[in-house]
Amino acid sequence: MNVRVRHFMQSLDSRYQHKTVEEECNAAWDEHKIYKWKGNVAQSFVIDTPPPTVSGVLHMGHVFSYCHTDFIARYQRMAGKDVFYPIGFDDNGLPTERLVEKIKKLRAVQLERAEFTKMCREVSHEFRTKFRNLFRRLGISYDWALEYHTVSEEVQRLSQASFLDLYAKDKLYRKQQPILWDTVDCTAIAHAEVEELDLHSHLNTISFHTVGGEKIDIATTRPELIPACVALFFNPEDDRYTHLHGQFAVVPVGGHKVKILPDDKVRIDKGTGLVMCCTFGDETDVYWWRTHNLDTKTIVSRTGHIVDLAEDTPDAKIPAAQFDGMHVQKARKAVCDALEGAGLLVSQEPIVHTVKCAERSGAPIEILLSHQWFVRVMEHKHELLEQVQKVQWHPDSMRKRMEIWIENLNWDWCISRQRYFGVPFPVWYSKREGEVGKVLLPDVRDLPVDPLRDLPSGYGRDEVEPDVDVMDTWATSSISPQFLTKSVGQVLRNENLEPLFPTDLRAQSHEIIRSWAFYTMLKSYYHNGEIPWQNIMISGWCLAEDKTKMSKSKGNAMDPESTLDLYGADSVRYWAAKSRLGADTVFSEEVLKTGRRLTTKLWNASKFVATFFLRDNPPAGTTAAPTDLWILSKLHKAVAHNTENLKLFEYCAALNRTEEFFWKDFCDNYLELVKHRAYNHGSAHGHASAVSTLHHTLKTLLLLFAPFLPYVTEAVYGTLFSGCIHAQEWPNADEIPYNASLEQHGDALIKIVEEVRKAKTHAQVSVKYPVELITIGGLATDFPESMLEDLKHMCCAEQIKLTAPDSTELEVAVTLAPTVSSN
């Protein structure tokens, strides 16, 4: 494809100006649609790209992982694949709502639903534009014609079709049962949205008594839940309490009576060994409640306040009614104060313990009884673990994280959220006599629907109750492979795009293995009966200088725009590529500076090499000089190494090998060894061989660097060679000469050069200072004559002497020319 960057048509500027180059390249790429998917399904390489959440500005941590995917996309494109590389924006759900609330300095509950969702759409549009501009500056090679966003009508149609398909297959259900509740955002959440935080608290030892009057002590961190106590438990192996089996205890706050029961989940060595079960303090309470068929006493509201307290009995040591309406945090202290006043607070020990909190708001989780929609998980854990084994994980160690997550799951996936801006459930509930509560669904051809606005076929407004909840944002983004194919199981079909499933690659960071990766595997298994992608590539975190995860909420995130202004996109991409796949990396300006030095060196080396040939017209002649065959042998191995590693998504290893070849083999040594022949100071044959090799090696080097440094390589290639570099074929190692013997001789030659350089450095003389004699002994004494001639010119040596091999090691002696006295 004959695409050139106009600014550099004639020659390379004296300095690399990254801002000018980036603008020119983007304009040319857009004009010629370099990254457009051509529609060749059979030759496609399909990437399931993570849609960034519209929850605030992107930072260097996002840049880090999105660059990793682009390295692979660019390689696959050059390797002959028709790359299907979309970008989406996840702009529905709680993260976007929280952003709007922060920007507008209000809460969603203060506005009418329609007004707030309109505000959300406006803000998400603004941030999608910002995201788009940043990705373009980074040189991410998306096909922008494939762009989607999750609150669009098209994606809502697919998401609601997913719901209908799962409902038809009995893979989801609606039920009242215990759920995790965020009291700040006032919504149900899933286990994947929970983080564990170490918080300061107190372990309170509190006196209960049996109906018979025996004093018994329990230990708890949540005394405010005592009015919700429904049983006391002890371990059946604990001899201290076995006599209590079947007795009743009187709860001090409120005075109601509860059974004392054995259960082996109680730890004998924790607290007093006697535990109260409340509905609900934690997931163990839920287990006991279900297993022992206990009563339900729900006293925590959706906003985290104490409510619905039962009437106090005459046995109450402390009236519960006084705590009604208090927030749980305030009630915790108030209950302890009351217990202490009544002589029932035995002890209070300060502790730091792990508390499950909502990932977004940071609020400690409450467990409430509520009607919600759930996707079945528990009964299919074995099949899901089998699906995990079918995917190729890069690195493979990340597979274990998914396995552990699935093995430890105890609940089905709650997908309903009590929020406003999201994909609505396509559900109404009948109010007709004889079918009250019946679930009513639309025809798939009518999607998307909004139950608050639309009606099911054959029903009037007064005959239905719309489902007012919205879906978990993961319930939508988990069908990202289906976004690409416009198909969901058998419900929605697109025969032209269906062959793109399963996709070739999912790229994402490791913290969302438990959410995005897991939910996508779950949905694809239910919809399609197979894995969603052949490969999954997992990036690590970008860490701040204090080695904590870089994040907007922590205030330690670096601004990518200013970094791009200062260092340029290629330097930023270089920094991103220097971290091994799956490994965390600390943000480093030193690495950015190294990347900037690399782009400058590549620019300058290209200018130097270009002085020896006309663009795309190297001199005729066969590369035959031994030194030239040495560098081509090194190049052959670099190309083979990089091809193999990029096939395995090991971008870091590929860049490192290219960089090492460029700096050490090409710039530091080969250019110096070949300079005299390139300047035509030797034979015509030697000159032709040198210039042809320089031409071929530089061209191949640019191709090897292109996935990582797309701008500088485009500018150089578009000036010195023909066409757009990103539309060229990836180099083939088999087409580059390899000679093992000459590679060995060349490597030995470089060791000799290093000894000469050391001698000159030690003598504190110039690299151009003349050498009287280089004596070479050991095994490597059968150098081709022309190699020694190249060595002589490079080292400014008058004579090179080869001695008989009397050692298994290379031996080098350097005699510098005598210093000329100024007298």
UniProtKB/Swiss-Prot annotation:
- Mind telling me what this protein is named? Valine--tRNA ligase
List, alphabetically, the PANTHER family matched. VALINE--TRNA LIGASE, CHLOROPLASTIC_MITOCHONDRIAL 2, VALYL-TRNA SYNTHETASES
Q: Which organism is it from?
A: Anaplasma marginale (strain St. Maries)
Q: Which CDD domains match?
A: Anticodon_Ia_Val
Q: How does it assemble?
A: Monomer.
User: One Pfam match, by short name?
Assistant: Anticodon_1
Give the motif span ('HIGH' region). Answer: 52-62
Q: Where is this protein found? A: Cytoplasm
UniProt-listed NCBIfam families: PRK13208.1, valS
Q: Which PROSITE patterns match?
A: AA_TRNA_LIGASE_I
Q: Which GO terms describe its molecular function?
A: aminoacyl-tRNA deacylase activity; ATP binding; valine-tRNA ligase activity
What biological process terms from GO does the record include? Answer: valyl-tRNA aminoacylation
Classification lineage: Bacteria, Pseudomonadati, Pseudomonadota, Alphaproteobacteria, Rickettsiales
Q: Which GO terms describe its cellular component?
A: cytosol
Signal sequence extent: none
Q: What is its EC number?
A: 6.1.1.9
